[in-house]
Amino acid sequence: MAIKPQPQWQRRLASVLLWGSTIYLLVNLLAPALFRSQPPQVPYSLFIDQVEGDKVASVYVGQNEIRYQLKPEAEDEGKEKAAEGQILRTTPIFDLELPKRLEAKGIEFAAAPPAKNSWFGTLLSWVIPPLIFVGIWSFFLNRNNNGAPGGALAFTKSKAKVYVEGDSTKVTFDDVAGVEEAKTELSEVVDFLKFPQRYTALGAKIPKGVLLVGPPGTGKTLLAKAAAGEAGVPFFIISGSEFVELFVGAGAARVRDLFEQAKKQAPCIVFIDELDAIGKSRASGAFMGGNDEREQTLNQLLTEMDGFSAAGATVIVLAATNRPETLDPALLRPGRFDRQVLVDRPDLAGRLKILEIYAKKIKLDKEVELKNIATRTPGFAGADLANLVNEAALLAARNKQDSVTEADFREAIERVVAGLEKKSRVLSDKEKKIVAYHEVGHALVGAVMPGGGQVAKISIVPRGMAALGYTLQMPTEDRFLLNESELRDQIATLLGGRAAEEIVFDSITTGAANDLQRATDLAEQMVTTYGMSKVLGPLAYDKGQQNNFLGQGMGNPRRMVSDDTAKEIDLEVKEIVEQGHNQALAILEHNRDLLEAIAEKILEKEVIEGEELHHLLGQVQAPGTLVV
């Protein structure tokens, strides 16, 4: 859907008037100088000779010019005298004797009268300066308001973009995949906009507002555009941050202007992206004082959304946020945002549908199995998958291929997950050997401990900012629940790299820093969040945060606990991590020969994957006394 063009007739009329006035002024100023004839210019010496020769009749002496008229000459004595003499001009010089010469010859002379300004020039002298001042003032006003019409009050106008139906870029529900539940909820809104009588006949009321919540990149904005495209109604889109302005009251004025425009074009949809920019709870301390600009904007939004219609037509408000926990409760009450629709990351089937949509836009090789790509991308949102397809196409173009292959997709996945290959980062032979054993340690422990997923690739090619190598584990299915045993398996797999360094080199390096951090965090969550402690029992010591789609940041705050309880938590976390470490050591000691063989092979090839890797890892044996 394209942006609806703004009417331009006012600007065109102003341009015509401006150019017409400019041309008129230029003609009046330049025409006299261009078309008025000037007397011939002569040297001052010739002028003196003519005065001495008694040929001059009269002289007008000016500051910058002397004009004089010659005496008429008689052709013959029986004929009339010729017409008046010729008028000439010359440039004066400092000559104090000139008046005496003129008087001695009896020549009439006088000072030239001062030039008189015309009525037009007088008018310009009064009009032009104020016009210049007004023009400069208008220029800076328009510059501060990005050229928007409305002059000094333009900042009170809504900055919403209006999308209308009718072009090839129209978005429908067919362009959205992986969020079937959200599509179903919005389909009801679309159906009401198309056939309102079906609902009003039963006394039903459509929700006045629908709030789309979910992680970034899951398609909330795309869903709102698709809803407007399916309904075939005008679609107003604006970001929450565009309401807030430096001027006090501008945000509230823009809210009023937005809803006034929406009422005029009803039925329509108003979409407010990033609602948390103006909808934060007033009780959270986010506002500094009762007259804060954001609070005024929120109050105006609450007022406008409290049930409004335009001549029986409907205006529906859609909004999107990834921080619903920060929104004001008054904004979420029934009658304003009646529904909250979760737009979550897609599952395997959803990822496959999204890949099929974006794969239509590129030249795909016939051998590509999109289901394999969907399986290798757990946790990817719609925007991540779109970027993945584009990265694969760019890689194919870089390699001058005719189509995009599955190898391009695998490389694109690794670029997104682990970062770019750093082939220019040269490691010493010793460091390269340490990295090789470290990554093989992860792989061998992961092959015995299935809780972390299937090992798909081992690489010692540096990637990203810090990774000197990596072991890629891919889940075989979408998982939503993990048991205690699987979490312990993940901890043991994370510590497999450090365990391999201890066994082979009898020392440890800084390469396991991230592994230790992740293992400790996971063990702490087992104790404080999931209640997986035999000593502390089924208690949660973390204050959970619901609907936190942006990640945990600094982590959930811990409840107030006694010193003894805090000590028990630390001991339990330490015991879980140490147990995982011992499991990793036992597995690698039991498979020491295989560890050496795979490490030598990866030092030669740098990358092992596919059937070769599966064959090697299939030889791993679990020790008989493995502690679980």
Curated annotation (Swiss-Prot):
Induction note: Slight induction by UV-B light.
Molecular function terms, GO-annotated: ATP binding; ATP hydrolysis activity; ATP-dependent peptidase activity; metalloendopeptidase activity; zinc ion binding
The organism's place on the tree of life at top rank: Bacteria
Listed transmembrane segments: 15-35, 120-140
GO biological process terms held by the UniProt record: protein catabolic process; proteolysis
Family per record: In the central section; belongs to the AAA ATPase family. In the C-terminal section; belongs to the peptidase M41 family.
Stated name of the protein: ATP-dependent zinc metalloprotease FtsH 4
Species for this entry: Synechocystis sp. (strain ATCC 27184 / PCC 6803 / Kazusa)
